[in-house]
Structure formats: C-alpha cells, structure tokens
Design a protein with these regions (language model features):
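Short, internal strand/loop/helix patches
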Residues: 126-162
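Thiol-/selenol-based redox modules, centered on thioredoxin-like
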Residues: 158-187
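Short active-site neighborhood of thiol/selenol oxidoreductases, capturing the structured segment around
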Residues: 70-94, 100
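Hydrophobic beta-strand anchors of alpha/beta hydrolase catalytic cores
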Residues: 82-83, 109, 156
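Structural microenvironment flanking redox-active thiols in thiol-disulfide oxidoreductases
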Residues: 94-129, 140-146
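N-terminal targeting signals for export/organelle localization
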Residues: 1-62, 187
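Generic structural signal for well-ordered beta-strand positions
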Residues: 69-70, 166
Length: 187
C-alpha cells in the first residue's frame, strides 16, 4: 500500500457527525419550556398558600375617598367581582395595575392596598400612578390579606354573582386572564 492509497480527510470533506438527540436545538428548547412549566406547577401551591375557598367573606369597606363598598350588594347585581390585593412596594403589583384599572371599567373591582401607606399617601400614590382612588381600600394592618388567606401579593379573587370564590390567582396574571376568569364565573 502506498502513501497515496490512504484516504485522508481534506478540508473539502463536509462530513458531519450527527448530533446526539439531546443536543438538538428543538429538543433543548422543548426541555427548557417543560422545565419552566414543571417549576411553575410545583411552586404554584406554595404561592397559593392557605387562600380561602368557597363563600367569600362579608365585606363592608370604605375606599380612601370615603366611598362605601359592600361585596354582597355588588354580588346581588348579577356580575362577578374582582378582589385585587396588592401593595405599593410590590414590583409585580406595579406591572399589573394598568390591567386592573382597565378591568374596572367593565367589572366591579375592590382594589385592596395592603401593608402600604396611610390614606393621604395612598391617595397621592393613586393620583401619581393614574389609578382610580374610588376603588382603593387601605388595608394598612393586613386584615383583608389575612382574611382571604393570601401569603403573597398580588392576589386576585374572582367572586361569582353567587358570592362563591371561583378563581384565585397569586402572582402576576394578565388582564386578559382575569377577564376570562370573570367572564367564565358568570356562566
């Protein structure tokens, strides 16, 4: 056998070794998405904590502008109510406030600011952030957060016209997700 008989790879040879299945981009991306979904589903019960289920508690509250809100009276109007618990110091709550304000144009919303500011400061905060102060209830002591069993903010409770808590979401939820839940709860 001569030296020229040997086949040696040259720069022109374009033979590639196939990637193992787990290194293919679509497999990596699918596994990443699956991992995030699994993590979300595992963390979700911890975030939900011991939130109440069943009938919503009786609520007779006053907003920072002095307006009286009665949850049971709102339920009797035949539309669902969104109870939104948030805090001024919560960055996720800040991200969702525009959606909550838009929902309040179509549905009744009880907007509970928990463990945040006094009434005057909260009124200034509402004006500065273009929020409707007639919907904001000051829960400085955290009473309503405890009553609803929320361990984190934002916490959203969709209450059906029957007064039953239909859906609970803790953490960021899109306005469309909340609208869908509100619509579904009145069927």
């Amino acid at each position: 056998m001569t030296k020229s008989d040997k086949s040696t790879p040259t720069a022109n040879d374009q033979t590639k070794t196939p990637l193992p299945m787990w290194k293919k981009p679509w497999v990596k991306n699918s596994l990443t998405v699956l991992l995030f979904v699994a993590a979300f589903l595992l963390i979700r019960p911890i975030m939900q904590g011991d939130v109440i289920q069943g009938q919503a508690p009786a609520m007779q509250v006053q907003t920072i502008t002095g307006k009286q809100i009665n949850l049971q009276a709102l339920n009797q109007q035949g539309k669902p109510v969104l109870v939104h618990i948030w805090a001024t110091w919560c960055p996720i709550c800040s991200a969702s406030k525009g959606g909550i304000e838009s929902i309040s144009k179509d549905y009744d919303v009880i907007n509970i600011a928990t463990q945040s500011l006094d009434d005057d400061q909260l009124l200034d905060y509402a004006k500065e952030h273009e929020m409707n102060p007639d919907l904001i209830v000051n829960d400085l002591s955290g009473h309503w957060m405890t009553t609803f069993g929320a361990k984190a903010v934002p916490a959203d409770f969709v209450i059906a016209p029957s007064g039953k808590i239909e859906f609970v979401e803790v953490g960021f939820t899109t306005s469309w997700g909340l609208r869908l839940r509100l619509w579904w709860s009145q069927l």
